[in-house]
Amino acid sequence: MNSPQEISILFFFIIFLDYVSAQSPPPPNLYATSDLFKPSLAIITGVFSIVFTLTFVLLVYAKCFHNDLRSETDSDGERIRHDRLWQGLFNRSSRFSGLDKKAIESLPFFRFSALKGLKQGLECSVCLSKFEDVEILRLLPKCRHAFHIGCIDQWLEQHATCPLCRNRVNIEDDLSVLGNSSTSLRILNQSETREEDSRLEIYIEREEGTNDGSSRFSSFRKILKKSLLLEREGNENIDEKKLMHKFNHRIVVSDAVFKNRWSNITSSDLTFLTSEMLNSVSSDRFSSVDRVHRGNLRDKEDMEMKRMLIKHKDSSRRTVSEITTVSREKAVGGSYRGSTASTSQNYAVTATTEERRRRLWLPIARRTAQWFVNREKSNDLNTTRQNLNV
């Protein structure tokens, strides 16, 4: 009886050992720890990727779009800002590719000596050298900035923006701003006879500023060049150089404004017909009339004086007594004073009439210019809205 019990106990012991061996912990997995770190590593990689992408997008935005949007004036409005933004999004590669050589050569150019206005001390913002009368300048019609023809050609081969204001150069849009003036401007310097007979007049408008210029062009070389320039131009007007900026300018092509009739003026020319230009033209116009009138009055007075002197000599010969001589001299003096009073009265009436004409003409010219400008802006807004609706 003992043997079966021993056998059963041994049997249960063997089964227990098998069960315990079956429940023993498995050997440690070498890949368990790596599996635990895989999700956290993926999260870290994703976060770094997102941060890098956002940083890259912000840098591209600041480089490509921020300067262009900042260069727009407040009068252009939100329409131009959105157009420039979309152009930058879809034509990002063309911004840095430059322009074609034929497109660059199609831009208008002129001689610096043909430029009228306060052009003394004006410098090229590409090479930082002063313009000379014999040099040829190329004009960017949209922003109205001019540079040395060699400097701007090399710049436009590598860039598609203006080196001064960073506005994009679009050949078709730029030439449409000038209209017929662009063709005559390109032909201007092909022959000296054309330059003399041409009706084209080019004026410069410069911003007020100090001699220091823009901070973008401040460098040690520019400071040395400025000191040499002051030494060479000691005889020039110092106050005028202090008031005018050396780089910031605008070229106004005014073949229609000053030479043609009002019916032939285009809206693009009237855009730059400011009140200062109207005041200067009107003052020159009426001051010339006054000068002619004053010259005629002086001639009449001289003739009257000569005639009275001749009469005085004849009367002194003919008179017998001093009483008659004195009376005749008084008569002559009275006639002279009467003629002087009449001429001064005529001059006052003429000056009043000319002043009245000037006051009537200036508001009409201003309203006409403003009407053309508003019509051009409304046409541009309608065209933009139609394109957006399509």
From Swiss-Prot:
It is found in: Membrane. InterPro entries: Znf_RING, Znf_RING/FYVE/PHD. It is a single-pass membrane protein. Its EC number is 2.3.2.27. Pathway: Protein modification; protein ubiquitination. The keyword Transcription does not apply. The chain crosses the membrane at residues 41-61. GO terms for biological process: protein ubiquitination. It catalyses: S-ubiquitinyl-[E2 ubiquitin-conjugating enzyme]-L-cysteine + [acceptor protein]-L-lysine = [E2 ubiquitin-conjugating enzyme]-L-cysteine + N(6)-ubiquitinyl-[acceptor protein]-L-lysine. GO terms for cellular component: membrane. A zinc finger (RING-type) spans 124-166. Disulfide bonds: none annotated. It comes from the Eukaryota. Keywords: Membrane, Metal-binding, Signal, Transferase, Transmembrane, Transmembrane helix, Ubl conjugation pathway, Zinc, Zinc-finger. Its main location: membrane. Residues 1-22 form the signal peptide. GO terms for molecular function: transferase activity; zinc ion binding. PROSITE patterns: ZF_RING_2. The keyword rRNA-binding does not apply. Belongs to the RING-type zinc finger family. ATL subfamily. The RING-type zinc finger domain mediates binding to an E2 ubiquitin-conjugating enzyme. This is Putative RING-H2 finger protein ATL12. It comes from Arabidopsis thaliana. The gene is ATL12.
